[in-house]
Amino acid sequence: MTHDHAHSRGVPAMIKEIFAPHSHDAADSVDDTLESTAAGIRTVKISLLVLGLTALIQIVIVVMSGSVALAADTIHNFADALTAVPLWIAFALGAKPATRRYTYGFGRVEDLAGSFVVAMITMSAIIAGYEAIARLIHPQQIEHVGWVALAGLVGFIGNEWVALYRIRVGHRIGSAALIADGLHARTDGFTSLAVLCSAGGVALGFPLADPIVGLLITAAILAVLRTAARDVFRRLLDGVDPAMVDAAEQALAARPGVQAVRSVRMRWIGHRLHADAELDVDPALDLAQAHRIAHDAEHELTHTVPKLTTALIHAYPAEHGSSIPDRGRTVE
């Protein structure tokens, strides 16, 4: 399914994209379940490798500078990078087949991992805010300014590359958890950017740059947190893009033999989309004919809605005057 509208351009749109990446909820092109799961695991592996290399470069800078504070910041960044491991485990578990106890499979583990990522972003915001206020009340002198600035630059580049990579693949495979983890990497990039800006401010003779930049970065992390929490919790509450429901209703209503669409319900299970629909068909049809209409409608639906892997269609004999029920169009 393509989108005809043009994305806005300019600095405001670019800033909005950083804090709230554009999303239509569904993915763009990867429709095979196994392929999308493999893409998610591959993304986690590559991003961990890049973050590990970033941390290694920062460790070299720490050794050359002898800065204890810089060493602590490097350890913090490395620990944050390891939060991708639960998501890796979630992707692996999500690929397991359904059982008699977990009849929908294990895809929901991915959404739980997304909740963990949101918790880590929340912790990052709290720590950043606390440190900024503490340095505002009790200013601390920044030593080894040049080395600190270099470490901040390396950290920002590495984390932002990982953020862009995870967010792009997350949109492509329909994984809210992977997008949230990309946003988490972006918050770490913000932290490194704060180090760089603070070092620059101190070098220019403005020591208060450190806590002020810290407060600004805290606000930026909170903006990212809002986006990540919204997307992950919508998945946990079975929220979907209303445009997908509209597309499904239109596709079903256009099928031969369908007199009305009673209802369409959708839910994400990890990065897989499931749908249930109720159709009204001609009451004169026999059971085999009604089944054929439902089967064809299911086939049409899986080709119309991106990332829809399973659909359950119920066909009912139409009653006189039946029509699509008015469920309202108010959406959040």
From Swiss-Prot:
The keyword Iron-sulfur does not apply. InterPro entries: Cation_efflux, Cation_efflux_CTD, Cation_efflux_CTD_sf, Cation_efflux_TMD_sf, CDF_Transporter. Induction: Transcription is repressed by KmtR. Induced by nickel and cobalt. Keywords: Cell membrane, Ion transport, Membrane, Transmembrane, Transmembrane helix, Transport. GO terms for molecular function: cadmium ion transmembrane transporter activity; ferrous iron transmembrane transporter activity; zinc efflux antiporter activity. It is a multi-pass membrane protein. One of its GO terms (cellular component) is plasma membrane. The keyword Cytoplasm does not apply. The chain crosses the membrane at residues 46-66, 75-95, 113-133, 145-165, 202-222. One of its GO terms (biological process) is intracellular zinc ion homeostasis. Signal peptide: none annotated. It is found in: Cell membrane. Belongs to the cation diffusion facilitator (CDF) transporter (TC 2.A.4) family. This is Probable cation efflux system protein Rv2025c. It comes from Mycobacterium tuberculosis (strain ATCC 25618 / H37Rv).
